[in-house]
Amino acid sequence: MKSIAIIGASGYTGAQITSLIDADKNLVIQGLYVSENSVDKGKPLSELYPTYSHISLPLSPLSDEAKALIAEQADGVVLATDHAVSLHLAAWFFEQGLTVFDLSGAYRFSDKSQYPQWYGFEHDYPQVLSHAVYGLAEWNGADIADSKMIAVPGCYPTASLTALKPIHSLMTSSLPVINAVSGVTGAGRKAQLNTSFCEVSLTPYGVLGHRHQPEIATQLGQEVIFTPHLGNFKRGILATITVQLKEGVTQADIEQAYAIYDNAPLVTVKQNQFPKVDDVTNTPNCHLGWKFDPKTGYLVVASAIDNLMKGAASQAHQCIKIHFKY
């Protein structure tokens, strides 16, 4: 059994990955950790999330002594922490020889010049960054298996890239237009006015400036127009994407492109039938649906995932299973 420490376990994503690892007979939880200043330190996870009443582990403060114990006892560490926190923790644990599964954006760009603009910090660990691989599980399995620094993709990029990567060679240079809606858990657990029950409403945000736009573009190899929206539901993402395909592309070409997922059990592709968020909520699945207009060459593809599962925790769990080869 492999031992995994989970840092940032009090948040939505941290609690979700805790539940997945707890249920995995090939893994054991070394410990659950929060920052030393957290109001949740010392509490059992089940006090914060009664859904996980079967998990009695406490949320321990991440002291220097705790970090040393993790380095001694664990095989891997999951970071469900803020980008600026993960930046330093990931480098430290990587240098101790642990495999790092980072759910933040601190290691998703290989080009360190991207970080000041999109994350507000200079990247201090170019050597560690050079080892980082992008953990899009269905596409980068070999790299995930070989590397000890796995940057788990963002939720919107996971939904968008799963839809677009199979058809990239069929697309023109016209920018794909991605309109995506996420449930409010994507904004995190901290209280905010715009995500409170009485205030939340369907609205776009981060227009022409969301940090997931360059993440999608980098991994796709093509610029995109990406507009995220906040929806008045708890969890899930629906991305509806319009792309122009090259002249002469046929419906059969599209079918063949998406056949790459025939052996991917977590990805379902349907033609002329579009996914619903409710069908993927609380699952590790991605549902794709597409329709093609041969007269105009436009393809519309919709992608539905659970933002806390396939968009975060269950994809991290996939990466753990791929890396430790079970």
Curated annotation (Swiss-Prot):
Reactions this protein catalyses: N-acetyl-L-glutamate 5-semialdehyde + phosphate + NADP(+) = N-acetyl-L-glutamyl 5-phosphate + NADPH + H(+)
Pathway note: Amino-acid biosynthesis; L-arginine biosynthesis; N(2)-acetyl-L-ornithine from L-glutamate: step 3/4
Pfam families named among the record's database cross-references: Semialdhyde_dh (PF01118), Semialdhyde_dhC_1 (PF22698)
Alphabetic keyword roster: Amino-acid biosynthesis, Arginine biosynthesis, Cytoplasm, NADP, Oxidoreductase
Primary enzyme class: oxidoreductase
Key word Ubl conjugation present: no
Principal place of residence: cytoplasm
Any GO BP annotation: L-arginine biosynthetic process
GO molecular function, one term: NAD binding
An example Gene Ontology CC term for this record: cytoplasm
Statement: the UniProt record of this protein carries the keyword Membrane: no
Entry annotation: catalytic residues: 155
Alphabetized SMART domains for the sequence: Semialdhyde_dh
Subcellular localization(s) per the UniProt record: Cytoplasm
Signal peptide: none
Enzyme Commission no: 1.2.1.38
Xref: Gene3D superfamilies: Dihydrodipicolinate Reductase, domain 2, NAD(P)-binding Rossmann-like Domain
Protein family membership: Belongs to the NAGSA dehydrogenase family. Type 1 subfamily.
Function of the molecule: Catalyzes the NADPH-dependent reduction of N-acetyl-5-glutamyl phosphate to yield N-acetyl-L-glutamate 5-semialdehyde.
Matches recorded under NCBIfam families: argC
HAMAP family, alphabetized: ArgC_type1
Name recorded for this polypeptide: N-acetyl-gamma-glutamyl-phosphate reductase
Organism this protein belongs to: Shewanella woodyi (strain ATCC 51908 / MS32)
